[in-house]
Structure formats: structure tokens, C-alpha cells
Amino acid sequence: MKKGTRKVVRITTLVLITALIGVTLYFNLSSDTQIVEAGDDYIDFELETLDGDIVKVSDLLENQGVILNFWGTWCKPCQEEMPDINELYNEFDREVEVVAVNVRESNQQINQFLNSLPEEMDFTIALDRERDVTRAYNVGPMPTTIAINQDGTVVKKQESQLSREDIVAFIESAQE
């Protein structure tokens, strides 16, 4: 290759790499997605439920605190903690609202998962098909559970399976 051709190839490669870095930075830094952590105000959302209704956090917060539990059908810890969440939800006379947010799975997968559990779940199953809510609440591993008190403050977040003691702590935090 001639010296002049090599120089053109190097400059073109450098320009392309710089452009790719610029585009990547632009899309990552210009995102208007808010990420919520403990201590922040909640981000409101509307999601369709497995029953075909719409659930909206702000409507639920009018009467009580809310616990969001993000889960997937493939998640063994999710399967293990759900019956405990349901049992304690009922033991506490539903003093907080529990919304189990499934991430990107079909109704068939969800129903098959729920049917494999030892009992029927009494709380709301919401469907985050586009992962908008999952991203807004900065959910990484599943299960992830978030407690929001009635004032609309995220008071607790855990990115792992909840023990029965953890579930009680989440319910009590959401009641503050």
C-alpha cells in the first residue's frame, strides 16, 4: 500500500472510532430516564395487569404504601419468595399494596409459573413489557424489591431474594 493510501485509511479509521465514541456517549448521557434509589421520590407509572386492568402507583399511594417486586419466571429465588410475600401480605391484612412486576414475559409463561406455585397469589401481577419501569427503578438482578411509603418516598430497596424477616421489614417500611 502506498504511503498516501495508508494515511487516508488511518485518518478514516480514527474519524470513525471518534464518531462511534461520540454517538455512544451522546445516547448514554442524554437519556432523560430517571433512576430511582432509596431516599428518592417514586416515579409514577401505569402498567397493565395480568387480569387486563391498569395499575398506577399514585392511585395506590392514596390509601397505603406500596411494595414493588420485580421478578421473572426463570428466577428460582423469585419462585421461592413469592409464597412468603403472599402469606405475609395477607397476615398484615393487606395494609400495604404489593405489585409483582413481571419483566418482558408472555401471559402464558407467567400463568405457567403462577400455576407451579403452591397457592394462588392474592396481590397484583403487573406486566412491564417494554422494561420502562424496570429501567426507571434501576432494577438489575431479580428479584428486586422496592418499598414506597405513602408520602411517595422510596424507603427500601433490595436486589436479592427476601427472607420472611426481610418481607416484614419491607411491609413495615412501606407503612411509615
Identify the residue ranges that each predicted region occupies:
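N-terminal targeting signals for export/organelle localization
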Residues: 1-46, 176
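A generic structural signal for alpha->beta connector loops
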Residues: 44, 64, 95, 122-123
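Conserved beta-strand termini and adjacent loop/short-helix elements that scaffold enzyme active sites
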Residues: 50, 57, 101, 126-128
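Hydrophobic beta-strand anchors of alpha/beta hydrolase catalytic cores
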Residues: 67-68, 98, 145
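Structural microenvironment flanking redox-active thiols in thiol-disulfide oxidoreductases
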Residues: 79-117, 129-136
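Thiol/disulfide oxidoreductase modules built on the thioredoxin-like
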Residues: 115-121, 128-175
